[in-house]
Amino acid sequence: SKTGEITLDVDYLSQEGILPTGCETVSAAMVLNYWQQEILPTDLAEQLPSENIRWDESGKCYGPDPNEVFVGSPFTTWGYGCFAPVIEELIHDTAPLLEAETLYDRTLEQLYTDYVCRGVPVLIWCTICQLKTSPGTVWELPSGETFTWPNNEHCMVLVGQQNGRWVCMDPYNGNGRITVDKDLLDDRYDSMGSQAVVTIPGGFFP
């Protein structure tokens, strides 16, 4: 690979056959294992706060805020998913020796430079197989606001850069370590609200 490019050595975990919609949890488990906090993805998923969406008689849909809980169940194929703050909380609750922080509006380039290059893998929200997202199920949040689920929502671990492409650990379908065109992944990450979670041992950065 090109000079100055690095890829972190993160052991791969697949969500296939165990957590069909648990990409966020399986990605988080890869990061926790990287920091020697050994945990099975299924054990982590058991501790994930989750809530189902429901329909009333008129067909109106009500559901939780994916910034607060996992929507549905990661153990099922019809689970939806959750956003960065839920995983940040999950890491706080299960690995108190680690510090986790949700980051918004950083570019992947910034995450790579500020964290990956310093030995810190980053959880990023993107799309399954780099597909485009599209508006999915619509429901009313507890706040009364209307929320539209972004189809193909996914979470992977950004671990490096190789030959000018991003390197990620992709829990989907046993995909393993993948390299993705930078512009493509930048776009998909952007389409999911440019959200990420960094996890570091306390006192790791001066």
Predicted regions, residues:
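Active-site-adjacent structural segments surrounding the nucleophilic cysteine of cysteine proteases
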Residues: S1-P85, I128, G136-P142, T146-W149, ...
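Extracytoplasmic
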Residues: I18, G119, N151-E153
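Structural recognition of the beta-strand scaffold that forms the well-ordered cores
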Residues: G22-E24, A100-T102, P121-C126, V157, ...
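A mature extracytoplasmic/lumenal domain signature
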Residues: S27, Y104-R106, C126-Q130, G160-Q162, ...
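Mid-length scaffold segments of soluble, non-membrane domains
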Residues: P74-Q110, D114-R118
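Short acidic/glycine-rich loop or secondary-structure boundary segments that cap or lie
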Residues: Q110-L111, K132-S134
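Short, flexible beta-strand-to-coil junctions
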Residues: I124-L131, I200-F204
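Noncatalytic regulatory segments and standalone regulatory/sensor domains
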Residues: G136-P150, M156-P206
